Each structure stands twice: as C-alpha cells, then as structure tokens.
C-alpha cells in the first residue's frame, strides 16, 4: 500500500515460501516476516520485525496520518502468545497493538483482514477462526465492540463505519457513529462474494 505521501510503499512480508502447486509451506523453520517501508525509487526506508519469528505479517491498513496497522497469522504453537495485530505510528517503532488476552485467544492465531476509518478513528479487524469482528478506537487502543459473524473475513471502511463480508456469503454494514455499533445485513448478488473485500 502507498503511504499518504504518495512516495513511500509499505509492504507486509509474510516470510513464508509456499510451493506453487501444493500450497505447502516450505520454510517455517526459517521465516523472517517483516514490515518494510520502501521509497518509490527503491530506497529502503526501514525494515522492522516483531519478536516472534513464526508470526507472518499478512494484512495492512494505512491511516491518513501515516499510522500503519498490520494483521498477523501465527504459524507456531497454538498456545504461544503471538501479537496478532501490530501498529507503527508516525515516528515510532513497529510494535504489538494491545489486544487483551481474551481477544487474542478468540482470534485463534489468525487475522483475515483489517481496515481503518479515518474520520471515526476506528480500526476493524476480522478473525474468521474466532467468528468475530473487532472494533477498536485507533488512538486509545480501547476495544469498542466485538461482534459474532461466522467466517468473517473481508472488511472495508464506508461513510458510516465498515462493511464486513464472510466466506459464507454474508455481508453486514456496521454503523459506528453511535455509542453502540449497530449491524444490518446487506444483500449480495447470488454467487458474488469472497473472503476479501474492496469497495469502489
């Protein structure tokens, strides 16, 4: 994704080499996931890693102020305490976002997607293994709400909040303007859905 300056690319390096046909992960013992900032001319600005080597940096969202948030998928022991969401605020290091242990356990070592709502200063993260979507205040890192949605995956910011899709063909609009986040179903054309979401 491009940073707000239009000159810097932010890259999530998952660190996993996958065999093309079988999709088998080939290098779990030598993973080096990272968050990279790269200038348009190819100059490396920064390369930062989280402490857990098997924590694959997979998904990114960038706020208008240059805050970068990443979602991880942990390939190690299911009982390990890996940071599944991380944040890089302008001028600061790439570091774990404070989830809370109950949230981390609900995620079951896997995030699918995330999005930032710049006007409302909210972060939305989907966790399909935990059948949950989470909404945080981006500035205070306070959890606003957790909502049950089976196999939720895609998420995108819209005027009033977020749209979230699922691998089961469900789609919800979450209105985040009030104190409580309200959800309403959205109708999708038959057969036109996916685990990823981009709104135009």
Describe every region a protein language model picked out:
Residues 48-53, 98-108, 145-150, 185-188:
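Surface loop/turn motifs at the tips and blade-to-blade linkers of beta-strand repeat domains
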Residues 25-42, 82-91:
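Beta-propeller blade signature
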Residues 11, 69-71, 125, 164-165:
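Residue position within the beta-strands of beta-propeller blades
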Residues 11-31, 71-82:
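Short, conserved, GDST-rich strand-edge loop motifs in beta-rich repeat architectures
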Residues 39-42, 89-92, 138-141, 176-178:
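Short loop/turn segments that connect beta-strands within beta-propeller blades
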Residues 31, 55-58, 81, 110, ...:
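Beta-rich catalytic cores
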Residues 7, 65-67, 119-121, 159-161:
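Short coil/turn segments that connect the beta-strands within blades of beta-propeller domains
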């Amino acid at each position: 994704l491009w940073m707000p300056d239009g000159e810097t690319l932010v890259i999530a390096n998952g660190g996993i080499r996958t065999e093309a046909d079988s999709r088998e992960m080939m290098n779990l013992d030598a993973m080096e996931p990272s968050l990279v900032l790269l200038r348009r001319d190819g100059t490396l600005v920064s390369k930062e890693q989280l402490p857990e080597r098997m924590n694959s940096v997979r998904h990114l969202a960038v706020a208008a102020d240059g805050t970068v948030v990443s979602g991880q998928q942990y390939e190690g022991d299911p009982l390990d305490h890996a940071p599944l969401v991380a944040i890089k605020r302008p001028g600061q290091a790439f570091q774990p976002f404070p989830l809370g242990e109950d949230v981390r356990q609900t995620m079951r070592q896997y995030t699918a997607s995330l999005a930032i709502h710049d006007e409302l200063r909210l972060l939305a993260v989907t966790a399909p293994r935990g059948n949950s979507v989470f909404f945080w205040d981006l500035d205070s890192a306070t959890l606003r709400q957790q909502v049950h949605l089976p196999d939720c995956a895609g998420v995108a910011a819209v005027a009033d909040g977020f749209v979230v899709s699922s691998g089961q063909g469900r789609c919800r609009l979450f209105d985040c303007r009030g104190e409580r986040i309200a959800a309403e179903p959205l109708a999708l054309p038959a057969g036109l859905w996916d685990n990823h979401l981009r709104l135009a």
